[in-house]
């Protein structure tokens, strides 16, 4: 019987001191696509949070207290909601409970832990070179394998295809 052998092309990355793993399937180009989408969504979420902060500021503009507990809680809620949305997006890209793995020590100390936007931004920034390496090389190999120059006489220019 014939047997088809296929490279799994899985990349394992330790995400904490306990060596919990993020496993990337480098054959799945949609992971890279979702990561790019995540990056775009974070920018949108950041802009939305700024607008919500302005709304909170306007809502409490007539209160003279320097420190108003309700206003403070409203600001904190905006930050918490933004962080939770970013965590949901990260989990969509890298798998369920990805953030819990990365911040495992924090969750062990406090099960209700929510990382702030800075910690999440640093996490995303640390993932960029990993994603570029994992998927950039794959994209380059694919382009080299199927580039127009290697197809020789079957290659047509854009103008030839239009005619």
Kindly give the residue locations of the regions a language model identified:
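Residue-level detector of functional hotspots within protein domains
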Residues: 8-10, 84, 88
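Intrinsic-disorder-associated interaction segments
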Residues: 24-31, 35-38, 42-49, 75, ...
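Short N-terminal mixed-charge amphipathic segments
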Residues: 1-71
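C-terminal charged interaction modules
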Residues: 88-163
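Intrinsically disordered, low-complexity acidic Ser/Thr-rich regulatory segments
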Residues: 65-86
